[in-house]
Design a protein with these regions (language model features):
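Short, well-ordered coil/turn elements that cap or connect secondary structure elements
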Residues: 24, 65-67, 114-116
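N-terminal glycine-rich dinucleotide-binding loop that anchors FAD/FMN and/or NAD(P) in oxidoreductases
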Residues: 44-73, 120-122, 129
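Rossmann-like dinucleotide/flavin-binding elements
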Residues: 9-30, 81, 126-157
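Dinucleotide-binding/catalytic capping subdomain of oxidoreductase cores
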Residues: 31-34, 53, 68-69, 116-118, ...
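Rossmann-like nucleotide/phosphate-binding core characteristic of flavoprotein oxidoreductases
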Residues: 1-9, 20-30, 47, 82-93
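Short amphipathic alpha-helical segments
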Residues: 19-21, 43, 109-113
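Glycine-rich FAD pyrophosphate-binding loop
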Residues: 25-41
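FAD-binding core/adjacent interface of flavoenzyme oxidoreductases
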Residues: 2-4, 74-145
Length: 157
């Protein structure tokens, strides 16, 4: 086993599989994740009733977290405005820092009124029904009529 540690920030699919590859090369890996549970959108972005898909991913991720040279720390956001900064991670002198933080942003269409009350993004809604704080406590009030823009899996869910 190598002596110097690799720090991976983000435990979504990219971070998890990067961790597996790095750990299998013999490096100790410290895996830091903003959310309590690993998985990113694979955990919080899949409709809860799709249990087969979620369970399969959880099983794969569990095997990675069970590797003897992997240490997982959830609820550890990294960045300038958080308890752990990038500078502090660099001070630990890791052999490498890997950032696999995903793309949680919401795309805007540029339509008039899309910022009004009662307009919700799919991301916020999916996080809500997967109970990811702070989205789990959001009130998704609607009027008598609704419109869904898009045709991906979230629309079907």
């Amino acid at each position: 086993m190598k002596s110097r540690t690799v720090i991976v920030v983000g435990a979504g699919p990219a971070g998890m599989f990067a961790t597996r590859k790095i750990a299998s090369a013999g490096y100790p890996v410290v895996l830091l994740n903003r959310d309590v549970k690993p998985g990113g959108l694979a955990e919080y972005g899949i409709y809860p009733m799709k249990t087969h898909m979620k369970q399969g991913l959880r099983k794969q991720f569990g095997k990675i977290l069970d590797l003897p040279n992997v240490s997982y720390f959830g609820h550890m956001p990294v960045g300038a405005n958080y308890a752990v900064t990038i500078d502090e991670l660099q001070e630990l002198n890791p052999v490498a820092l890997v950032f696999a933080v995903g793309a949680q942003g919401t795309k805007k269409l540029g339509l008039p009124g899309e910022g009004c009350k009662g307009i919700y993004s799919a991301k916020d809604f999916v996080y809500h029904y997967n109970l990811l704080p702070p989205f789990s406590g959001m009130d998704f009030s609607t009027g008598r009529r609704i419109a869904i823009i898009g045709m991906g899996n979230v629309m079907v869910d």
